[in-house]
Design a protein with these regions (language model features):
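Catalytic cores of the polymerase beta-like nucleotidyltransferase superfamily
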Residues: 1-134
Length: 136
């Protein structure tokens, strides 16, 4: 059983704000593992179907980071939460070529997907653990 008191109030508020804006939001990865083990997570990561630009619009105290693999850091005075958009595992076009931008850079890491696609593209470790906070 997960002790809700060990979940960051800030992470909960981010997920609730995503939900209010009609987006999904889940705790993901190591923080879920720690919670399942009864430990206090060191940090919290969130996965969502909102694009980085949509996350940035919702949270004024945030910044988009990364060129190849875009993420959003949402922060307050004491915490920084990393918010990642669900990604698709698809990195090929229908004819089998890698998807590239106009400059020739491979853009497979920024192809948005859904929860199922995001789960399948992650390695089968703690990175594929998702926790819904719908009842918190």
């Amino acid at each position: 059983m997960i002790n809700n008191k060990k979940i960051s109030k800030f992470a909960i508020s981010i997920i609730k704000d995503l939900n209010k804006n009609n987006f999904e939001g889940y705790l993901v990865g190591g923080c879920v593992r720690d919670l399942l083990c009864g430990l206090e997570p060191k940090d919290f990561d969130i996965a969502t179907n909102a694009t980085p630009e949509q996350v940035r619009k919702i949270f004024k105290a945030s910044r988009i980071i990364g060129k190849r693999f875009k993420l959003v850091h949402v922060f307050n005075r004491s915490e920084l939460i990393e918010v990642a958009t669900f990604r698709s595992g698809q990195d090929l076009t229908n004819n089998g070529h890698l998807i590239k931008d106009q400059s020739g850079k491979i853009i497979r890491d920024n192809i948005w997907g859904n929860l199922d696609e995001d789960t399948y593209r992650r390695d089968f470790t703690v990175n594929a653990l998702y926790l819904s906070l719908i009842h918190i």
